[in-house]
Amino acid sequence: MGAHSADGIAPRRSKLRAYLLLARVSNLPTVWTNVLAAYVIAGASFDSLLIASLSLSLFYTGGMFLNDAFDARFDSHARPDRPIPNGDASQREVFIIGFALLAIGESLLVLQPFPTRAARWGLALAAAIVFYDYAHKDKLYGPIVMGLCRALVYLVAASSATGIEPYRVVGAASVMMAYVMTLTYVAKLAGRGDWVPWLIAGIRIVDAIFITMAGGGPVAATVAIAGFIVTLALQRVVPGT
């Protein structure tokens, strides 16, 4: 980000830069490997992988926009360089975009092989995202709901492609939920340390382990591991927190 002025406010950014910051796009690769891992574990055909990845990317991006929209008052004094308090985007604008992205993500699920089941899990994910964004400052409930959101990504992806939620997918989702809960809880206690981006990128390593254990082959596992480096590199351009 640009140099800060004496009052802590960053220079005005372009809309594109503001939206990239709001979306925390550097973390999107972790969503893609979540979807890939869910497909591999569920034994699903990759024919619908792209739509699932796009849908869940929109869920994630919408959630990130809403995170800033709900936090606008807090950020005005705690993080004045965030796009809303910095004047790069209005709170109303960010709310509208956030909810629109969730709606589009949910709508894309009708294109999946099992749209009804996918839509139900998608609504559960949307509800969890909105609840997290509204109440995540609570140090007890926030990490739990954040972990639940990640677990639901697995369930949306697997159910949309296969129509079921195999116990292996539920197990992997539970492990990922525990990982993200721990990451979020520690980050809330310790603040945004230099190691937090590594833990976020580490989601891809967990996915790579799941893919390997499920017999997904070296290519899929390598993609997930390579994404660890990609995520860290992107976080140097667009911060992931």
Predicted region positions:
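Short juxtamembrane and helix-loop transition motifs at transmembrane-helix boundaries
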Residues: 12-19, 59, 75-87, 101-111, ...
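Membrane interfacial helix motifs at helix-loop boundaries and amphipathic/re-entrant anchors
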Residues: 42-46, 113-117, 159-166, 213-219
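Multi-pass membrane catalytic core of lipid/isoprenoid biosynthesis enzymes
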Residues: 54-55, 72-129, 147, 153, ...
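Extended hydrophobic alpha-helices typical of membrane-associated regions
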Residues: 191-241
